[in-house]
Amino acid sequence: MKPENGAATWHPAKRSCLGRLTTLETLLLVFLGLLITALLSVLFLWLWVLDGYKTFTDGRPIYPLPFENSSVAVDRSAKNHNDVVCTSRECVRLAGFLAENLNSKINPCEDFYEFACGNYGLNKNLPANKPLRHTISDVQSRLNKQVKSMLQSPISANEKPWDKVAKGYYQKCLDEEELESTGVEAMRDIAKRIGGWPTLEGDKWQEWSHSWEEQIALVLNLTGVNAVILEMAVTHDPSNSSRSVIELDQPKWGAGSRYPYLSGANDPMLRNYTTLMKMTAVALGADPAIAEKEMNEAMEFELKLVNFSADDMVRRDPERGNNRFELWQLKSVFPFINFEKYLKTVFKELVALSPNHTVIVREIDYFVGIQHVLQSTPKRVLANYISWRLVQGFSPFLPPSAREPFYQFKANQTGMFNSPPPDRWEDCVTLSVIMMDMPVGRLFVENFFEKERAMKKMTELTSYLKNEFIKQLHVLDWMDEITRRRAISKANMIEYKSGFPMVLFNDTWMEKNWGMIIKPREYLLHLTIRVKLVRFTEELLRLDQPLDRSMWFQSPAQVDAYYAPNNNEMIFPAGIMQFPFLTLGVPNYITYGMVGAVIGHEVSHAFDDQGGQYDEMGNLNDWWDAETEEKFIEKTRCFVRQYENVHVVEADIHLNGQLSLGENIADNGGVKTAFNAYKAWKSNTTGISEPALPGFQNFTSQQMFFLAYANNWCSLVRPKHYIQIILTDVHAPSKYRAMIPLQNRPEFAKAFQCPIGSPMNPERKCQVW
């Protein structure tokens, strides 16, 4: 109780106690109190740091945590990061990933790929049966093991039917003993169903009485095998993305690329391909002499077809392939191909085709050219070729001894002579992800995907990336205002889908689509065909129906990302949303540099030389001002020249700047947009420095962003495989996807203080977006 006059109350006992202390003891007691206060202050400061600098300014944290349960420590060497280093398990793991690849002896301004990825080859081996290895394939390998662990577990009675069918398919695929005893029989049975393989049957083969058009329609209806002589699809109408149309196109070729065919039958790859055809026929029971003669004839027939086909670079223009006909008009343009008979046989009673149904013919010259070839080719040759392509497509279902030549053919294409075949489980995982896409995807999401945190992070990333791309559109000096408004409208309307389709966890939908039962002793090949035909029937039934834009056309369990121009949407499956691309619990300079650049890449695809021809609704539409379009084309020519000037020493070949143009535009736009998005995120969070990664205390956040980006593309490639990539792949080899976009970025040169004219800071740079 306080006295009225405010004087302190006297306590004699306490005074007596203090009174007995000497002056020295009093000073020591005061010092002890100060020491305890100082220690408590240090402890409080330490807890403050561990809690992620949760100091508030204007109601917001100076350093907002990019993840939960962070762990950081003070490190005076981390001058660029306010003396703070991240010590969480995620940060340590990511730092180890970067450090393992880093070659710090290289000057980053001389060769940044070698700086960032130079030790990748020292710490990673290139398997004898692989043509290349890179960061993406490493993630795919880990995902394959994750899928394997789920599918190999025993099937229990109380499991969902779609889980049972996915596991049952995989486990049946693994049964090599069954394949050894039934694989040839199952394949011969399928060949018999489609009219027989003459090479196997010899003189006993009976020629079919119907036309070749009806024959390939029959093959499609009975097996789901499509791209033989021609390829048919029910797909988006290029001019009206809300509806579906029939599309007819040239097929894919048995040897892969069309390039070896251009050299004729004596091309080494085609000789290997013809040998494969003969060996397969003999493995299935053909007389070697008959196989020799008739597979040569089949090869010559395919060669004639390829001669009328279009080059991939020419096919890049979507407007060129938008050749629209009504069904009744096809006869006048292609008088010797009965497309009406073919299509009506394919659709049967599922959809009633009228003469006015729209048909898109992507390659008019191809179909005009092959008419006379097909007229003059004996049915026996046609039947041999069709049967061969059927068996080739189903080669994973052959016994091991009959599969071996297929592995060797592929290996020889990429310089892997006498390489061992992959383990069977790898093939079976791949087949399961393709054939059981949604059941396997659901299992993967349930077991290995952090849905809430990952989806939340992707929402943040896509929002920042989209906003930054739109900001870039606002300041382009070569784009007129009308085109700019349309471009901004398109960018705003891009739909971002990440993780998995919502129907994946709709049990009713899963039961309807994947409630099938594996029949006792059903051949693996027959089960596969049964699944293919269900999916193919669904495709046919989409004709004339409103398009369901919520559909996904690949499994969530895939390491991939893509932009679909006819839907104006981009999809990021759960498979790519994992370490190292999306590592939850690391600073954002890593996240934006890795998966952020992937998002930026896909955003840029909406405006590359192909995607830019589609409007905001996904319709093929000339929405560009003519002068602006010419300026755009001129800027893309800079990329073509830049990439084609690069000489790949390992294969003594230059990059193909035209074939890879769309991907190069996207790579360059992607890293720029991701870097600007990171800066925007940082600005919106008061700009405080994020913690360093352990071992990278001397790097700035900007340097770490570019280091993370380059680590997307660390790779090992066999020299011969470089040739195949450059001639046939729309992507540049990984090394150059890391290097060239950074050579074009002034922000990179500034971050590493690269002098103008140095290899990583050339005077002439290319940029579109």
From Swiss-Prot:
EC number of the protein: 3.4.24.-
Entry's Gene Ontology cellular component terms: plasma membrane
Top EC group: hydrolase
Cofactor(s) essential for the protein: Zn(2+)
Cofactor notes: Binds 1 zinc ion per subunit.
Cytoplasmic face residues: 1-26
Single biological process term from Gene Ontology: protein processing
Extracellular side: 48-769
Membrane topology designation: Single-pass type II membrane protein
A Pfam family it matches: Peptidase_M13
Subcellular location: Cell membrane
GO molecular function, one term: metalloendopeptidase activity
Catalytic residues (positions): E602, D667 (proton donor)
Record-annotated membrane-spanning stretches: 27-47
Principal subcellular localisation of the protein: membrane
Positions annotated with a glycan in the UniProt record: N69, N221, N240, N272, N307, N356, N412, N506, N684, N698
Keywords assigned by UniProt, alphabetized: Cell membrane, Disulfide bond, Glycoprotein, Hydrolase, Membrane, Metal-binding, Metalloprotease, Protease, Signal-anchor, Transmembrane, Transmembrane helix, Zinc
Residues annotated to bind Zn(2+): H601, H605, E663
S-S bridge residues: C86-C91, C109-C754, C117-C714, C173-C428, C638-C766
All residue ranges annotated as the Peptidase M13 domain in the record: 85-769
Function: Probable cell surface protease.
Family that this chain belongs to: Belongs to the peptidase M13 family.
Protein name: Neprilysin-21
